[in-house]
């Protein structure tokens, strides 16, 4: 079973990790055959997404009998000693990894970012209040629509809709509302592939950021935010949990009609265990935090991500227009790289089919924009991005 899990590759070039890739052998040649059943693929899914192989193997080794406890984490009571230690270590490691100040709470919540789009409104504003939203793509649009249900005014203070969400409006042009309770951004748009490169200066207003798709991809200046939130299923762990980092002074002001599960004070007072939490996702996320610490922290993570993104963007930019990135170069995402083929829809279809046959999984662009998209989160090895770039070059040579 372990052998299959590792996905030992056959000889020759293939678009998936094999024994050579894990040893640093970056020799690549086009395979042209579908990977054998049981081999691991290069998974470019936008989420749920690829997880670190060593973390998966640790989970596999402990799955039936966790650290000699006689049971699986899947079976443990969240109130039991073993699980309480797992949960406490996960929070401690996350605080160390990110450098979270003592005046911020860390909440491990069910529902993901979509739920927190609503719970932020319940905790930070009354129904008669206003909040400002910067629209840079599908997820910030979704957050604003949720805010419009719960606030008197969910003001669109800036939008790049006219540019098809391929850029980010300059902060000096944002039309912020007097007295607004918070300013909401999505730090990285998974679908459109645009990413904030600096924390926007909104003065003394409360900045709220959905970081679902670039959580832990680089250092975070936590003190510049009031709330940082996001689902973990893209860059941290399996689906089923969101992590919310909230400044203390923003806790305890929830509306009277706020559901208990949305009330940040209730969740903080109960150490995120007001009800049974998403235990297994929390556990695996904790393993990822520990791994990132061991691997050098977020500065090292960022450097690896820059190198990976450069490989892919260089493949696009040096293709003489064969591959096209629609995104403003100033705001290109390190995590999600959408691109099209200048040859049109039929050629894109052929590209995606060949890529899948060679072990490059989930490259199809989001249904709302089409084209292709490679999500290259923390756990995607550089060898995977290099293999994709090589395949792209080869495909062009055969089809130009």
Regions found by a protein language model. Name each.
Residues 114-183:
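PLP-dependent aminotransferase-like
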Residues 69-116, 123, 138, 146:
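Conserved N-terminal alpha-helix of the aminotransferase class I/II PLP-enzyme fold
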Residues 47, 147, 159-215:
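Active-site phosphate-binding strand-loop segment of PLP-dependent enzymes
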């Amino acid at each position: 079973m372990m052998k299959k899990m590792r996905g030992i590759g056959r000889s020759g070039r293939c678009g998936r990790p094999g024994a050579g890739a894990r040893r640093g052998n970056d020799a690549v040649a086009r395979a042209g055959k579908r990977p054998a059943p049981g081999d691991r693929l290069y998974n470019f899914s936008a989420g749920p997404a690829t997880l670190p192989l060593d973390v998966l193997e640790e989970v596999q080794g402990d799955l039936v009998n966790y650290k000699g406890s006689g049971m699986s984490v899947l079976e443990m009571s969240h109130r039991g000693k073993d699980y309480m230690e797992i949960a406490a270590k996960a929070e401690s490691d996350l605080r160390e990894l990110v450098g979270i100040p003592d005046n911020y709470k860390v909440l491990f919540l069910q529902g993901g970012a979509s739920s927190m789009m609503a719970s932020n409104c319940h905790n930070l504003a009354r129904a008669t209040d206003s909040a400002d939203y910067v629209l840079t793509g599908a997820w910030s649009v979704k957050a604003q629509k949720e805010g419009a249900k719960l606030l008197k005014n969910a003001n669109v203070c800036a939008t790049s809709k006219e540019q098809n969400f391929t850029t980010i409006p300059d902060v000096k042009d944002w039309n912020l509302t007097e007295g607004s309770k918070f300013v909401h951004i999505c730090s990285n748009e998974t679908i459109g592939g645009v990413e904030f490169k600096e924390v926007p200066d909104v003065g003394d207003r409360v900045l709220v950021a959905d970081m679902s798709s670039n959580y832990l991809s680089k250092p975070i200046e936590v003190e510049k935010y009031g709330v940082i939130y996001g689902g973990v299923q893209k860059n941290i762990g399996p689906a089923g949990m969101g992590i919310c980092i909230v400044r203390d002074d923003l806790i305890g002001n929830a509306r009277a009609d706020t559901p208990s599960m949305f009330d940040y004070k209730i969740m903080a007072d109960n150490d995120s265990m007001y009800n049974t939490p998403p235990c297994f996702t929390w556990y695996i996320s904790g393993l990822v935090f520990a791994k990132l610490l061991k691997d050098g922290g977020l500065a090292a993570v960022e450097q690896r991500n820059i190198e990976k993104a450069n490989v892919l963007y260089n493949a696009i930019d040096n293709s003489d227009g064969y591959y096209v990135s629609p995104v403003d170069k100033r705001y290109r995402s390190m995590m999600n790289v959408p691109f099209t083929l200048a040859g049109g829809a039929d050629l894109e279809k052929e590209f995606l089919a060949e890529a899948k046959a060679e072990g490059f999984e989930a490259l199809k662009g989001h249904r709302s924009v089409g084209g292709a998209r490679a999500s290259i989160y923390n756990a995607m090895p550089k060898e995977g991005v290099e293999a994709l770039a090589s395949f792209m070059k080869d495909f062009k040579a055969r089809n130009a």
